[in-house]
Amino acid sequence: MQTEKKEILATAVGRRKEAVAQVQLLRGTGEFIINNKSANIYLNNNSCSLLALKAPFNVLQNLEILTESNQIDTIVKVQGGGLIGQAEAIKLGVARALCQIEVSGSETTDLIRKSFKDQGYLTIDARVKERRKYGLKKARKASQYHKR
């Protein structure tokens, strides 16, 4: 895997919970590599996560912007969080990077962005873990209350 020889089309960052994904889109053969491993191997063949990662590319194929002739390699470096949080961070990063790709015509770029917005791929899920409060066992879990 030599990323320096391939043309970098776009870069973006996606975040979810504690996971941070740095995404690079390169002109290539359509490979999806996460932390120097194939996406299938990295996500333990979890079909739901794999479908979520490929969904932004499917939107582009439905709009007939991305064809087999101009395939895109996706190189991802992801840290922190669990597998599902990482998968959602990667999905957001891929969608952001695909919005940055130069396509012929400004209407096409607006169309890509609008379709991603409608599908919810550019929406950030801002929910994070609630902090633990003193006097409690967890964020909201308290010891059992005794009246007498």
Swiss-Prot record:
User: Which NCBIfam families is this protein grouped with?
Assistant: PRK00132.1
As for subcellular location, the record says: Plastid, Chloroplast
**Name under which the protein is recorded:** Small ribosomal subunit protein uS9c
Which cysteines form disulfides?
none
- Give a Pfam family name: Ribosomal_S9
This protein's major location comes to plastid
Keyword Transmembrane included in the entry's annotation: no
Q: Do you know which SUPFAM superfamilies this protein is assigned to? A: Ribosomal protein S5 domain 2-like
Q: Which UniProt keywords apply?
A: Chloroplast, Plastid, Ribonucleoprotein, Ribosomal protein
Family from the record: Belongs to the universal ribosomal protein uS9 family.
Specify the domain of life of the species encoding this protein.
Eukaryota
**Gene Ontology CC, one term:** small ribosomal subunit
The protein's matches in Gene3D superfamilies, at most eight in alphabetical order, are given as: 3.30.230.10
Q: Extract the InterPro entries matched here.
A: Ribosomal_Su5_D2-typ_SF (IPR020568), Ribosomal_uS9 (IPR000754), Ribosomal_uS9_bac/plastid (IPR023035), Ribosomal_uS9_CS (IPR020574), Ribsml_uS5_D2-typ_fold_subgr (IPR014721)
**Under the GO molecular function aspect, what terms does this record hold?**
RNA binding; structural constituent of ribosome
- BP term (GO), one: translation
Q: Which organism is it from?
A: Tetradesmus obliquus (Green alga)
